[in-house]
A protein has these predicted regions:
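N-terminal glycine-rich FAD/FM-binding segment characteristic of electron-transfer flavoproteins
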Residues: 1-250
Length: 250
């Protein structure tokens, strides 16, 4: 095996309390901390572990987004990726368009594995990996909680409603990662400094010749409804009375 391609999406940091714009057209991102999508960070960690075991020789991180996404790619390089590719786009790229972009990069890079987070924490679409596998006409294993490689095959364990399911797939393939797969490494200052010298290629999205036309339109964003304050009751009888008063029971 030679190469692993890893997708890194730029998202609002999971510790940030997201605010909806007053006009409901989106969320406030000005001055907000941005980070690597946590599921993608796990995908990168798994790729690095595979390389460290000698099952891959190169890890390439890819991001589709604005010029500022270079920050997240540099973080990926600091974690240990060998090089980075930014497909620059100032507009939102939907899952199908993202899958088409990855397919173009696959034609150029010829990876054995494409590792993606199972979903982004911003839109929670959970679609790009599946769409990419279909376009590439290669096997897929989603929600991976364990990945084992054996030559030209991968054995992937995934959590399903009934318990655990283990799939064996031929490579090349697409694998999407769940939070239980691993714990990403901590990036130290020397690695951050080294990452500045690693190659980062920028490609204009228009140069790929990919149809990125929007397939749907977001009508409005609404913040979650405010929760009413809880009511303390002394005993079961008082609880029953309160539920009857609200018409929840008869």
């Amino acid at each position: 095996m030679s190469k692993i391609l890893v997708g890194l999406k730029r998202v609002v940091d999971y510790n940030v309390r997201v605010r909806v714009k007053p006009d409901g057209t989106g969320i406030v991102t000005d001055g907000v901390k941005m980070s690597i999508n946590p599921f993608d960070e796990i995908a990168l960690e798994e790729a690095l572990r595979i390389r460290e075991k000698g099952a891959a020789t190169e890890v390439v991180v890819v991001s589709i987004g604005p010029a500022d996404a270079q920050q997240q790619l540099r973080t990926g390089l600091a974690m240990g990726a060998d090089r980075a590719i930014l497909v620059q786009s100032d507009s939102t790229v939907e899952p199908l368009a993202a899958a088409r972009i990855f397919l173009k990069l696959i034609e150029k890079e010829a990876p054995q594995i494409v590792l993606l987070g199972k979903q982004g924490i911003d839109d929670d679409n959970n679609q790009t990996g599946q769409m990419l596998a279909a376009l590439w006409n290669r096997p897929q294993a989603t929600f991976a909680s364990r990945v084992e490689l054996d030559g030209a095959k991968a054995r992937v364990t995934r959590e399903v409603d009934a318990g655990l399911e283990t799939l064996e797939i031929d490579l090349p393939a697409v694998i999407t990662t769940d939070l239980r797969l691993n714990e990403p490494r901590y990036v130290k200052l020397p690695e951050i400094m080294k990452a500045k010298k690693k190659p980062l290629e920028t490609i204009a999205i228009a140069d790929l010749g990919v149809d990125t036309a929007s397939q749907f339109r977001t009508v409005k964003y609404d913040p979650p409804a405010a929760r009413s304050k809880g009511v303390m009751v002394k005993d079961v009888n008082e609880l029953v009375a309160a539920l009857k008063q609200k018409g929840l029971i008869q």
